[in-house]
């Protein structure tokens, strides 16, 4: 049995190709079922996000599994098989295990350390479990991958450093104010940057979010999404004095907020600090606003310095994480290899037990005067001898399970305990001997 990974992601395929393979929630069940019905596939799970569509599974024939999956994905996406294959990666064994671990730990993400992938990874496993397309091996693989992810995040702090402008803005606000639960926020602008900032602020538990935009409908839409209030653009200055944090992200060509505005606001707020983040290009807040007492202005370049520094720190953390990940991949691979030889070990022990039972039956028939206790003691002694004799071969098999040439040793031992050595042959030989004696 081999673990495999096949699919595409932001590294291998452009967004227009990824879009064609995007799998919606209501399509996922059918696709899981279809792939799980492939004879060479024993377990399967699908991870589908905006940046990747990847299929993880267990197979006894990787080539057949890959070929069948590509056919299914080709039919699903409408892309020709040979066109689709240009964008696909195909991994087996250790490489597949390592890739899956890296994905769950966010080491393969577009933004290293981003936390969303953990939830997406869990959801992929939960869905596969609901559809009964995962069993023992993938269950352990996902459990270990999530444990590794948690261990890496805890020990390296890889997710703690802001690496987006919007997130950095919120982290900066936390440094200035500490607790944000009693702070009002005003978003000036309702574009993508403002939306990202609103998302981070909302998850940080701010008191209230006001949204103002020249197009009022956009302000209403964004405010409703985060339980805030929409403000008409011409009413902006009525709400500025109530705002502790102001995030500006508009397309204006010149400053909207000026020094004189905040001098008046400072008087109304009686010295309570105001934190302003201008992530507009060109800047929408006049630079001399920073000269007003209790007003703290940061622009996109200030935040970029923070982001660049944090990106470098994340890269260093990622190097440390890679070392931890390699160790865990080795452990899982060792477990999987031992699992592969488990049937052989069971076969050898079953063979020994059959011999034990047969020989004891013969012995007890020849010695009918033995009582139950004596028979039990003899049986225990024979079992102990068998366990002693089989201990070293068992350890030998487990040790060889992780070697590159393990199949050579496994085949030899499997042949030794194959049907030509089985108990039926032994019984037949003894029956012939008895016939000759008679």
From Swiss-Prot:
Sample GO molecular function, one term: NADP binding
Q: Does the keyword DNA-binding apply?
A: no
Family annotation (Gene3D superfamilies): Glutamyl-tRNA reductase, N-terminal domain (3.30.460.30), NAD(P)-binding Rossmann-like Domain (3.40.50.720)
Query: Which pathway does the protein contribute to?
Result: Porphyrin-containing compound metabolism; protoporphyrin-IX biosynthesis; 5-aminolevulinate from L-glutamyl-tRNA(Glu): step 1/2
Binding site residues for NADP(+): 189-194
- Protein's UniProt keywords contain DNA repair: no
Binding positions (substrate): 49-52, 109, 114-116, 120
**Enzyme nomenclature, EC number:** 1.2.1.70
Quickly give the catalysed reaction: (S)-4-amino-5-oxopentanoate + tRNA(Glu) + NADP(+) = L-glutamyl-tRNA(Glu) + NADPH + H(+)
- What keywords are assigned to this protein? NADP, Oxidoreductase, Porphyrin biosynthesis
Instruction: Supply the enzyme class, top level.
Output: oxidoreductase
Task: List, from the UniProt record, the residues annotated as the active site of this protein.
Answer: 50
| GO terms for biological process, alphabetical | protoporphyrinogen IX biosynthetic process from glutamate
Question: Where exactly is the site Important for activity?
Answer: 99
Pfam families (alphabetical): GlutR_dimer, GlutR_N, Shikimate_DH
Q: Which domain of life is it from?
A: Bacteria
Q: What does this protein do?
A: Catalyzes the NADPH-dependent reduction of glutamyl-tRNA(Glu) to glutamate 1-semialdehyde (GSA).
- Regarding domains, what does the record say? Possesses an unusual extended V-shaped dimeric structure with each monomer consisting of three distinct domains arranged along a curved 'spinal' alpha-helix. The N-terminal catalytic domain specifically recognizes the glutamate moiety of the substrate. The second domain is the NADPH-binding domain, and the third C-terminal domain is responsible for dimerization.
Q: What else is known?
A: During catalysis, the active site Cys acts as a nucleophile attacking the alpha-carbonyl group of tRNA-bound glutamate with the formation of a thioester intermediate between enzyme and glutamate, and the concomitant release of tRNA(Glu). The thioester intermediate is finally reduced by direct hydride transfer from NADPH, to form the product GSA.
| Quaternary context | Homodimer.
Q: Which family does it belong to?
A: Belongs to the glutamyl-tRNA reductase family.
Q: What is this protein called?
A: Glutamyl-tRNA reductase
| Highest classification ranks of the organism | Bacteria, Pseudomonadati, Aquificota, Aquificia, Aquificales
């Amino acid at each position: 049995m081999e673990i495999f990974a096949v699919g595409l992601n932001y590294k291998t395929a452009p967004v227009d190709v990824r879009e064609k393979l995007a799998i919606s929630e209501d399509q996922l069940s059918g696709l899981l079922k279809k792939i799980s019905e492939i004879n060479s596939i024993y377990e399967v799970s699908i991870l589908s996000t905006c940046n990747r569509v990847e299929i993880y599974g267990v197979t006894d024939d990787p080539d057949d599994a890959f070929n069948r999956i590509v056919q299914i994905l080709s039919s699903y996406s409408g892309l020709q098989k040979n066109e689709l294959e240009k964008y696909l990666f195909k991994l087996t064994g250790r490489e597949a295990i390592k890739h899956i671990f890296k994905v769950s730990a966010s080491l393969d993400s577009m933004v290293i350390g981003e936390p969303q992938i953990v939830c997406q990874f869990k959801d992929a496993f939960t869905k596969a479990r609901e559809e009964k397309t995962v069993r023992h091996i993938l269950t352990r693989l996902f459990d270990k991958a999530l444990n590794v992810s948690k261990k890496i995040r805890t020990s390296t702090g890889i997710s703690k450093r802001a690496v987006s402008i919007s997130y950095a803005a919120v982290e900066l606000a936390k440094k200035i104010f500490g607790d944000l639960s009693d702070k009002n926020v005003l978003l000036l602008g309702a574009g993508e940057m403002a939306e990202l900032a609103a998302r981070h602020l909302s998850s940080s538990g701010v008191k209230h979010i006001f949204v103002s935009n020249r197009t009022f409908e956009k302000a209403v839409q964004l405010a409703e999404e985060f339980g805030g209030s929409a403000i008409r653009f011409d009413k902006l200055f009525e709400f500025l004095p109530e705002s502790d944090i102001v995030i500006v992200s508009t397309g204006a060509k010149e400053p909207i907020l000026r020094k004189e505005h905040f001098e008046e606001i400072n008087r109304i707020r009686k010295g309570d600090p105001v934190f302003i983040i201008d992530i507009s290009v060109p800047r929408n807040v006049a630079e001399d606003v920073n000269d007003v007492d209790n007003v703290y202005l940061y622009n996109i370049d200030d935040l970029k310095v923070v982001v660049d520094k944090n990106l470098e720190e994340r890269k260093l953390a990622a190097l440390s994480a890679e070392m931890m990940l390699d160790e865990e991949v080795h452990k899982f691979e060792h477990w999987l290899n031992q699992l592969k030889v488990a049937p052989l070990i069971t076969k050898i022990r079953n063979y020994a037990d059959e011999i034990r039972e047969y020989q004891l039956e013969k012995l007890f028939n020849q010695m009918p005067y033995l009582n139950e206790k004596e028979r039990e003691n003899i049986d225990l002694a024979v079992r102990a001898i068998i366990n002693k004799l089989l201990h070293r071969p068992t350890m030998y098999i487990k040790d060889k399970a992780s070697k590159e040439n393990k199949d050579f040793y496994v085949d030899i031992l499997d042949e030794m305990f194959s049907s030509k050595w089985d108990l039926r042959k032994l019984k037949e030989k003894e029956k012939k001997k008895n016939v000759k004696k008679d």
